[in-house]
Amino acid sequence: MKVDVLLGLQWGDEGKGKVVDVLTPNYDVVTRFQGGPNAGHTLEFNGEKYVLRSIPSGIFQGGKINVIGNGVVLDPLLFKQEAESLAASGHDITKQLYISKKAHLILPTHRILDAAYEAAKGSGKIGTTGKGIGPTYTDKISRNGVRVGDLLHNFEEKYAAAKAKHEAILRSLNYEYDITEMEAQWLEALNYLRQFKLIDSEHVINNYLKEGKSVLAEGAQGTMLDIDFGSYPFVTSSNTICAGCCTGLGVSPRNIGEVYGIFKAYCTRVGSGPFPTELFDEVGDKIGQLGHEFGAVTGRKRRCGWIDLVALRYAVMINGVSQLIMMKSDVLDTFDTIKACVAYKMNGVETNEFPYEIDDTIEPVYVELPGWKTDMTKMRSEDEFPEEFNAYLSFLEEELGVPVKIVSVGPDREQTIVRYTEE
């Protein structure tokens, strides 16, 4: 067996939680391989809405194994809150969830450092969620991090050393803080974490594959936020692309199977950073209102714009996407015409390749397509798709070179249509 991967192809918030919930019945194991509690996956189960920040979305499927991989950074306090919320709703996850010993811990001082660094940047801030993600990955790369497996040996010494280094940095920044209460809660949450099975996830995942178990790897955020290939420096601190699955779980590239690339029928972005197709008019406001575009974790209003095929082609290439999944098609139901960016104009020169750096001087080159002007929310089969919508899908497939296999026409699970188009 191979690991199938589900990835966001834009700037995050594509709707991965819902799609994972639809796909998980087909898998034995669901994993997370990167990121932390800065991004939430929203999904509905039995009429209830849940936001999962660190726990894999397969947790609602009875009998599924869920693994938090080594590439994830874990905040014990936020993890405890998330797990207890699930338990209060009748979901006991202690037997279903395994955690990699090699996953790094987000310390209380990481969160303080995050706030201090952002404050020091002034107008140049990147819009961090303040969850300590960046400083935790910084410590990981500089070999100063504290890992989940350290709970089993010499934890107090390693924690004290990391905390002392952080406090020295904060003194140099003249940043005032008090972590007394947060630290007490965090240390209490560590004890809660100990009840879960702490594993050498690379061995466990590869043994599952040898046993013939099917594995789905669930990415967080989106390709355009990747630390290497995203719109740097307005990116996250981990590899959100398909290659991140290999390093974040310990699997060979030869063991990657299907790569599902998920995108919205339009674009959104949260926080600072370039956004070539952003709309500042009533059209952008309308998309945001119809799409309920607010962050699952931060509650921040998302910036909205037309679909960017330059960025999407780039994301498809980087990830080796084999199947596309389009979300929120219904949000565009009422538009007379729909625009799609097919190229950028930079210094008067047109290009269809994603550049080294994108900024406000980039001018999107649009094509216009007729809208379908039809309520798609009640459709349950591709046979019901209006002609204009089929034309839009064909246009996207031609531009991206990959079939759109799944179309979402609403937030509920049954509003997910699998297309049976030929290869």
From Swiss-Prot:
It is found in: Cytoplasm. Its EC number is 6.3.4.4. Pathway: Purine metabolism; AMP biosynthesis via de novo pathway; AMP from IMP: step 1/2. Its main location: cytoplasm. Substrate binds at A296, V297, T298, G299, R300, K301, R302. GO terms for molecular function: adenylosuccinate synthase activity; GTP binding; magnesium ion binding. It catalyses: IMP + L-aspartate + GTP = N(6)-(1,2-dicarboxyethyl)-AMP + GDP + phosphate + 2 H(+). GTP binds at residues 12-18, 40-42, 302, 328-330, 408-410. SMART domains: Adenylsucc_synt. Pfam families: Adenylsucc_synt (PF00709). GO terms for biological process: 'de novo' AMP biosynthetic process; IMP metabolic process. HAMAP family: Adenylosucc_synth. PANTHER family: ADENYLOSUCCINATE SYNTHETASE (PTHR11846:SF0). Homodimer. Plays an important role in the de novo pathway of purine nucleotide biosynthesis. Catalyzes the first committed step in the biosynthesis of AMP from IMP. NCBIfam families: PRK01117.1 (NF002223), purA (TIGR00184). This is Adenylosuccinate synthetase. The gene is purA.
